[in-house]
Amino acid sequence: MAREQFQTLTEPMYYILLALMEECCGVDIMEKVKVISHGRVVVGPGTLYAMLAKFEENGVIRLTASEGRRKSYIITEVGKEMLKQEYERLKTMVLDGSGRV
């Protein structure tokens, strides 16, 4: 179901899932996205928490801890498979364009 819900991932989605390869909370996710993307992708709180809710609802990530307002998440096996498929899709696109651009 998750794969059908998210046919392709937007850049913020992709980087959020990469950040969640390790357990972390929202503030840490925003910082990791910025670091992993070398500052190209900046995810604001509104976008982040909307995506986290959709990802959790679809079993892409899971809640690991909740302390007051601070919640931590990690990617699930479903999410890892989805991330891998998106990586392969992007890699294929780059290869298709190689030598043509």
Identify the meaning behind each predicted range.
Residues 1-7, 69, 93:
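Intrinsically disordered, low-complexity serine/threonine- and proline-rich regulatory segments
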Residues 84-101:
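Amphipathic alpha-helical dimerization/coiled-coil segments
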Residues 68-86:
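Basic, amphipathic "hinge/linker" alpha-helix immediately C-terminal to the N-terminal HTH DNA-binding motif
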Residues 3-47:
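N-terminal helix-turn-helix DNA-binding core of bacterial DNA-binding proteins
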Residues 56-68, 74:
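Beta-hairpin "wing" of winged helix-turn-helix
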Residues 47-48, 79:
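Helical "lid/switch" subdomain of P-loop NTPase nucleotide-binding domains
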Residues 48-55:
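Basic amphipathic alpha-helical segments that dock to polyanions
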